Amino acid sequence: MTTTEAPSALSFECETGNYHTFCPISCVAWLYQKIEDSFFLVIGTKTCGYFLQNAMGVMIFAEPRYAMAELEEGDISAQLNDYAELKRLCTQIKRDRNPSVIVWIGTCTTEIIKMDLEGLAPKLEAEIGIPIVVARANGLDYAFTQGEDTVLAAMAARCPEAATSEADQQERTNAIQRLLQFGKSPAAEQQPASSKHPPLILFGSVPDPVATQLTIELAKQGITVSGWLPAKRYTELPVIAEGSYAIGLNPFLSRTATTLMRRRKCKVIGAPFPIGPDGSRAWIEKICSVLEIEPQGLAEREAQVWDSIEDYRQLVEGKQVFFMGDNLWEISLARFLVRCGMRCPEIGIPYLDRRYLGAELAMLEATCQSMGVPLPRLVEKPDNYNQLQRIEALQPDLVITGMAHANPLEARGISTKWSVEFTFAQIHGFGNARAILELVTRPLRRNLALGTLGGSQWVSEAVTSR
């Protein structure tokens, strides 16, 4: 019998499996709502249309601000003129919806037939007078949430380098201040002026309540957010001047970070992501450190949040969680759950950018060591067959997985949680730590309830009889 020692450092593997994730064109689901004056045109086949219709559940009569440009046999065999067809569609969009920007979303089919969307867009943009942003979100090269990354990287190149005037810059700042002061009494508006520091851009799409919470948390430290990418309106894209600071909110935005560094000459701040009270504190502390501001009250704020989620921590303490890999949130979630007392033997992830995730990886390692649990094994592009064998051997208490594997695992008596739920939930910042544990513990609480009713015996008998 051989014994295996726990690794003293994070181990990285790549199994070169397929991308078993949601299609990245699903980014349209949240981006078209976030950018209120946009219109998304997905250029693909009927399969893409069926996916969007079913995944987003928006009925036709709701007139959503996205549409499908369905490729037909004539397009694939080059019998039709791509420019003429796209011009017809974009002219109709301009007439019916008049958006401030049209975003073309490329798919697998446009990649395979080598459709030159980047070449067609500038000519058509000049002709119809509406900006056209091209983003390739095909499932051949990108995982689920990386669709947002390609869109934001394309939009980063469109951000102005300088405000058109001092009055315009003041108006942008005042818009953020008005958002923070909405609903407050005049007396509450008297707050100390923020410290002078270089411009700070936050990039990553989050719901408006989360954006407000994070802006307020930074304002408490005397930090002013100069702009957001994406902005609520395309016409309000942030000014990105050379030397500006930028920091990401989501772990799947490595291409956007690279674009900001190389093309816009920004200084991208590397920090753990604001997931859980520990990550939120580290995220704010890193910003304060770079801007040379002394953080105030963060330790007390973190302790307060930990106390408020103690009931959920007791539920997960000592439990084992396994990440199969789907939405690139795996490392941040694993770090937070380990801090809550869970053990994580393996983290599968479709794509791993060690440079962009460097601070998060370092914090994961430090968290495991401080909690006295073995370091997880990180597997990039995992092979699902091999993963299933490891899950069968480990028998974890919970597997966080894509929807395709949830029911088969449940049929084998293994509790699961859909990773897609974390994508659409509000999970950033101090105030949403409880929401994460609410999602994670739901199957565990269900098992406890079944055990009380005697249902766990029925489940085990059903699994044994297979």
Curated annotation (Swiss-Prot):
Keywords on record: 4Fe-4S, ATP-binding, Chlorophyll biosynthesis, Iron, Iron-sulfur, Metal-binding, Nucleotide-binding, Oxidoreductase, Photosynthesis
Catalysed conversion reaction: chlorophyllide a + oxidized 2[4Fe-4S]-[ferredoxin] + 2 ADP + 2 phosphate = protochlorophyllide a + reduced 2[4Fe-4S]-[ferredoxin] + 2 ATP + 2 H2O
Classification via Gene3D superfamilies: Nitrogenase molybdenum iron protein domain
One Gene Ontology biological process: light-independent chlorophyll biosynthetic process
InterPro entries xref list: LIPOR_BchN/ChlN, Nase/OxRdtase_comp1, Protochl_reductN
Cofactor remark: Binds 1 [4Fe-4S] cluster per heterodimer. The cluster is bound at the heterodimer interface by residues from both subunits.
Names of required cofactors: [4Fe-4S] cluster
Binding of [4Fe-4S] cluster, residues: 23, 48, 108
GO molecular function, one term: 4 iron, 4 sulfur cluster binding
Known EC number: 1.3.7.7
Pathway noted in the entry: Porphyrin-containing compound metabolism; chlorophyll biosynthesis (light-independent)
Oligomer status and interactors: Protochlorophyllide reductase is composed of three subunits; ChlL, ChlN and ChlB. Forms a heterotetramer of two ChlB and two ChlN subunits.
Family, as annotated: Belongs to the BchN/ChlN family.
Function text: Component of the dark-operative protochlorophyllide reductase (DPOR) that uses Mg-ATP and reduced ferredoxin to reduce ring D of protochlorophyllide (Pchlide) to form chlorophyllide a (Chlide). This reaction is light-independent. The NB-protein (ChlN-ChlB) is the catalytic component of the complex.
Protein name per its UniProtKB record: Light-independent protochlorophyllide reductase subunit N
Native source species: Synechococcus elongatus (strain ATCC 33912 / PCC 7942 / FACHB-805) (Anacystis nidulans R2)
GN (gene name): chlN
